[in-house]
Amino acid sequence: MNADDEICRVCRCEGAPDSPLFHPCKCTGSIRYVHQECLVEWLGHSKKTHCELCKAKFEFTKVYSESMPRTIPFTILCRKLASTLKQRVIFFTRVLLTFFCWTVLLPLIFKHVWNLNFKIGDTYTIHARNKTFTAPQKPGYFESISQITSSPRLNTLIANTAEGQVLTFVVTFILITAFLVREWVLQNAVQVADELQGQQFENVNQNNQAQAAAAAAQNLREVREARQRLAMVMEHLRERQEQRNLELQRNGSFEEIERARQRFALLGDNIREPQEEENDVDVDEIFNRQQLNQPALDLNDANSSNSVPVEFNSLHSQNVDYRDEVDSLRPQFNVDEQSSISHSSNASENIVDGAVTQANGIESDFTRVDHEPIIVNNDDENGNNESENEEVIEEDNLNRNVIAEAQNQVVADEERNAVARAAQIAEADDADDFDGILEFLGLRGPITGFLQNCLVIAFVVSVFLTTAVGIPYMSGRLMVEWILFIIHRPTFILRFILSFVNILFDWTVGGAFNIVKILTKLPLLSTVFVKLKLQGIFSSSFQQVSNNMYSWIYDHVFSSSDHAYESLIYYMKTGHKQVVQSFSIFPVFRVCQMFAVILKDFVENYSNRPVDRVFTTLIGYCMFTFLGISYLNRKQFLFNDPQIRNVELAFREVLRQCGSIAKFGIIFSIELVVFPIFCGILLSMCLIGTFKKLAAENLLNVMTVYPAQSIFLAWFIGITFMFEFAVFISMVRKIVRPGVLYFLRDPNDPQFHPIREILEKPMLFQLKKIGFSAILYFAFIIGCVGSVIHLLKSTGIIFPIEFTTKPAVFEAPIDLLALEILIFLSIKLFKPLELTRSFWRTLVSTFCRCLRLSSYVMGQRYSDEEGYYPKQYFSFLRRIISKPSDTENQDDGDKQKAKKDFVQDGFFLWCPSKDVVPVRQGAMLIPVTENGYEIFGEKKKVEENADYTITYAPSNFYKRLIALLLFCWICSTLVTVLLVFVPLSLGRAIYAWCFPNVVKHDFYAYAIGFYSISFPMYAIHASVKFLKLDYLRSLMNKLNLKIVMRSLVMALKYLLLAFLGIFILPLLLGAIWELYVAIPFRTIFNRGTLALDAFQNWVIGLFMLRMIYFTVTSNEERFVSRLFQDAFRDRWTNPQILPLLKNVLIPFTSALIAAVVLPSVFTYVTYPFLSSIFPSASKTLMYRLMHPIFLALLGLALLGRRFVETSSKWSQGIRDDLYLVGTRLHNFGESAPPAISESAEK
């Protein structure tokens, strides 16, 4: 087939009368033409409308039926309109139903289930049953919502719906979070288990090294035996090949046979050489070398011109047998097979040329003999068949090209179809996911399925609320009620005990009394009782005797001790008060007394308050947690049935997973919620007195009245402080030597896994760690922050800071605009992060030089720090001033003298050199000699470890470290105070001079003072740097008239752009805001005199211009964004500002001017006519309302245009649905008619 033949690019077939070929794009060659059916099918797979190669858009023309009328009948339009309206009504009704179910019905159900759980817990308890009156419940936390309407029931419904929505959101968030945390925990738990198994495996390997060595020796012996067997097999193969070569000598030349024998001999060398080498040769290397060096039979004679193909099938079959024998040696050593067979066109060309060569370079000729016939040349038939061979070769080449092209086309079609199938499957998955979401929401699918989903969700959430809140609350309520009952009713318990004792006493002593009373009536015993004067006692009943005894004890015992009892009570009360007053000076005692008061208030006022319910629910969770831990610690099963044991095992696994999730949630909540709140409260306490109205009483009142807002503010302050502290620690890590902060975990450590650590470590260890961190943060905040603030407050110079929001200093938000610009310039010019890092690096290195800690802290060892000069009292100043290399440049005499006066002291430390070293108790800082021998203990040499290094440590090492921290803190505190005091004092003076009648505002004062100092300092620094680098002289040498003119033109361009961007455009945008928005609203609500503030409009215009700029330049593919990029690409040499002005700024400015001027001009021209129509409207009112009227008319015009477009599309859709027959593809460059009929197409 010729290259010019027209075939389809997809199906590779020619055109037909019923299926012609088209060239719809710019592509040429074999992919120029395509069938319309193939193209439509491909476009359906790819979801594209243009060619992927030339990006040309495919053009189709719609083909309509012959019976299509010119205009659609009105009845059809009405039916379609009714059908469309019906579908829209059904759809919007369904939307309203789903909206009602999701936002009203389900939240109300959840709210009632929530209230029902608490009502059951409050009803079926002892304390609640004893209540005779229950106060009516308030609407909840949504009191403002519950007062919207005048109907109480409707207000209650609205409040319950709002609370239910919040409850729904919280429950959904908790469920999703619990699911994600569970997956996260299980994933990390699996990794932990795998690592533990790996560690156990390593331990087993370490304990069984002898067995591993024996196994290695056995493998080595097997390798040697395999090597010997391989050599025997290859020797046998060589003998058989020599026999075959004798047969080949009859048909080939001796040189070719000798060449083949030499190649085959290389294999024997490769087999013999490894036997002579060491025993650690890999078996894989032997087999690979065997495959790479197998001989190739090349029986070709350059002088011969005729060749007859001869196939050696017998040779191949025998060699395959021996190859199988060689392969049988391999499986136990896992040797990779590398032999392959190539069938490429290059191999075919080698066959035609008369040579049998390797196609891929790594295959054996023995396995390739049956695929590639060996060509043996014949000199006798040299010139007879030369022309025939050339024809055969040419025909063979054509056939190979056709076959190769067909194979390539098949491969390309398969790849194209695979890509299309993959894209179709991915798109179908996305569509299914989207359809599933819509069906779940109720917008698609059967309505019964949606209602079923709602019922299932309501049931699941109700069960969750009952399980997670109701049952713990009821259980905790019962426990708390019983405890409070015992506390409230101690006399009841005593009465119960006394009644039990009384019954027992009556039963025993009364029975004995009656028996003795009977015995007294006997003749013999009556005389004995008369002599003992006991007959009168037994003459009465037991009840009378016991009552007389009780009255006698009370009269003779308690009456005499009343005075002593009253004295004891009086002294106990007075002593208690004195003890409380004496111990109240201690803060710990006051905290305990505060908690005692809170506990007393809780005990006395326990009811159904929110705080009580939270506490009760926590008590219930604690009880269930205790029961669950007790059950998991039980080593035996509760049941003996195997099936029940399986259920019990599953229940245990669920409890373990819940325990892991609860443990992670508790630790995570403490570290990210409770701990920041704790830090925020401490910082708030430290800031008491810094502001004018910030006192302890006010802070406590605010936290009491607004608890949620106060907790959030404390959390925000605390988390910000912790983040800044973490950034500071990260900066210190970059300054000091690696390994100094080994005791602080590095978050960037790849071996640090906080989640796995939470799962591995016990709960008590985690709580101890958090408590230790809390103590450190408490000490740091109180000691380093609170102490400084307290000292500054005692001076009365800076504090209290005056800050107010009413009245505003500026009517226009110029302060916000200035703050944004100044902060941006400050960050760009001053680079605060680099400046802070440089300050701390200088500070730490300077104090390390003073304290001789440079080797340990900074990793820089200096000889002058390893001792001292006895007669020099201020040697630290000498170390600061002098350079470390000064001692090396001294003369020999000076060095000897310095060495003679220098006294070495201190020692060396074996310390970590990385921050990720595992901490070992008592083995991190080991005193050693310079050579690495321990000073104390066994005095052995420490083991070499890349994670440790030797540094110098002076005498009093730990005291010097404490002094380093103390000096750094003092210097940083002084610098911070100066950065606050100096700008604030200067700013207050400038602010009072500029705004004498305005309320004091220290925020503005500090900003004015800071930038009044910093910008001049930066200008001086930049000027010195500019002069030092000699920029002026180099610039003056390059100046000429052309450069000056170019610079002036560029300056004029920038001035024009700045004038437009800073003055013209902001003023126009501010005027549009004022004329179209502000003035109409003021006119409607206030008909007084209105005045335009140009400054305020300019500020508002600047904000609007910035928003417009960021909106149009957010997408880099837009035309405006590309113009801005091109304009400022070469901003200092050749800025392209004119295209930007021509295409963007001038049209935009003209549109703004027209929007400002045209309504006023129209009002001026049409005022006589308008005044006759609206005689009551004044001229001023018309001018004020004309701009919004123009805006409304423009909006109506846009809506009308949109309505016309929608109507046209709708009628076109009806036409397509009723009369469309098909489409016809157009060739590239043809003008496509709008539509054709079916007869015209034919």
UniProtKB/Swiss-Prot annotation:
CDD domains: RING_CH-C4HC3_MARCH6 (cd16702). Its EC number is 2.3.2.27. Zn(2+) 1 binds at C8, C11, H35, C38. A zinc finger (RING-CH-type) spans 1-61. GO terms for molecular function: ubiquitin protein ligase activity; zinc ion binding. GO terms for cellular component: endoplasmic reticulum; endoplasmic reticulum membrane; nuclear inner membrane. Keywords: Endoplasmic reticulum, Membrane, Metal-binding, Phosphoprotein, Transferase, Transmembrane, Transmembrane helix, Ubl conjugation pathway, Zinc, Zinc-finger. The modification Phosphoserine is found at S253. The chain crosses the membrane at residues 90-110, 166-186, 454-474, 496-516, 579-599, 613-633, 664-684, 711-731, 772-792, 807-827, 962-982, 1003-1023, 1055-1075, 1090-1110, 1144-1164, 1180-1200. GO terms for biological process: ERAD pathway; inner nuclear membrane-associated protein degradation pathway; protein ubiquitination. Belongs to the DOA10/MARCH6 family. This is ERAD-associated E3 ubiquitin-protein ligase doa10. It comes from Schizosaccharomyces pombe (strain 972 / ATCC 24843).
